[in-house]
A protein has these predicted regions:
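A structural signal for short hydrophobic beta-strand segments in well-ordered beta-sheet cores
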Residues: 25, 145-148, 206
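Conserved beta-strand termini and adjacent loop/short-helix elements that scaffold enzyme active sites
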Residues: 54, 77-79, 132, 159, ...
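Short beta-strand-to-loop element that shapes/binds the nucleotide-sugar donor at the catalytic cleft/hinge
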Residues: 129-146
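Conserved N-terminal catalytic core of the sugar/cofactor nucleotidyltransferase
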Residues: 2-5, 13, 27, 31-105, ...
Length: 233
C-alpha cells in the first residue's frame, strides 16, 4: 500500500512561529511531525508516499529528501493555494499516487501501532473507503464529527451529534476517487467527498484509534515538547 501525506498547510493559528517555518516540520518530542508520520507509515507497510506541499514547500522537501532516510520512496506534488484536503489528494493522484492508499496529514501523530492497525483493518475490510475515528481529542469546531453504525460511517456531522471525531486519517479506494471531483468550494474537502460517497451507496468503514497529538497553537508547541507541562495544566 502507498500513501498521500498532506503537508501544504501554513498553520495560521501557530503564528508567528509559522511565519518562518511550515507547520509540518515543527516538532513533537523534538522531532519533525511529518517525519514521525512517515516513519509510522513505513511501519504500517507503506513503502511509497506522495507528499503534497505548498506553504514554504522547499523547507518540507529539503527535510524529507527522497525518503530514503525513512525507508519510503517519496514523490512530491505542489498545492499552490490552500484549496482543501480533497484538492490536495487529487493533486497527489495526478502526480502518480495509486489507490488503494492511505491519506494522512503531515501534522498529526498517532499512538504507536495505531496507523498500522488502521492500514491492516482497511485492507481486510475491502471497502471503498475508511475513516479513522477517535474520542480524544473530541469533536469540536475544527474537528468533524462522525456518526457510526456497526463499524460503518453513516454521516459526517456537526460535533454535537456524536462522541467521535475524525482522526485525520482516511483509506481511499479506487471506487471513491470519482467523488473527489465536482465538490462545492474552494475549499474542497475530503469530508464532503466521503459524505457524497456514502450518500451514493458506498460503504465507508470506521476504525477507532487512540488519542492523537497535533499542533494547533503555540501552547501546543510547548506542551508537546515538554510533557511535564502538559501534566500540570
Amino acid at each position: 500500500m502507498e500513501a498521500i501525506v498532506m503537508a501544504a498547510g501554513e498553520g495560521q493559528r501557530l503564528r508567528p512561529v509559522t511565519e518562518r517555518w511550515p507547520k509540518p516540520i515543527l516538532p513533537i518530542d523534538g522531532r519533525p511531525v511529518v517525519a514521525m508520520v512517515l516513519r509510522e507509515l513505513r511501519a504500517a507497510g507503506c513503502d511509497r508516499a506522495t507528499v503534497v506541499t505548498g506553504y514554504l514547500a522547499e523547507q518540507v522537501e529539503s527535510l524529507l529528501g527522497d525518503g530514503s532516510g525513512f525507508g519510503v520512496e517519496l514523490r512530491y506534488a505542489r498545492q499552490p493555494r490552500p484549496d482543501g484536503s480533497a484538492d490536495a489528494v487529487s493533486r497527489g493522484l495526478a502526480a502518480g499516487a495509486e489507490a488503494p492508499l492511505l491519506v494522512a496529514t503531515g501534522d498529526t501523530v498517532f499512538q504507536p501501532g495505531d496507523l498500522a492497525r488502521f492500514a491492516a483493518a482497511f485492507a481486510e475490510a475491502g471497502t471503498p473507503g475508511a475513516a479513522a475515528i477517535r474520542r480524544d481529542p473530541p469533536p469540536g469546531p475544527q474537528r468533524a464529527g462522525v456518526q457510526v453504525d456497526e463499524g460503518v460511517v453513516t454521516k459526517i456531522v456537526a460535533a454535537v451529534e456524536t462522541p467521535f471525531a475524525h482522526a485525520s486519517l482516511w483509506g481511499l479506494g479506487t471506487e471513491l476517487t470519482p467523488y473527489l471531483e465536482g465538490l462545492g468550494g474552494p475549499p474542497f474537502e475530503l469530508a464532503e467527498a466521503y459524505q457524497r460517497a456514502i450518500d451514493g451507496g458506498l460503504r465507508i468503514s470506521a476504525f477507532e484509534v487512540g488519542p492523537t497529538r497535533d499542533l494547533t497553537d503555540p501552547l501546543d508547541l510547548v506542551q508537546e515538547n515538554f510533557l511535564y507541562l502538559s501534566k500540570s495544566k
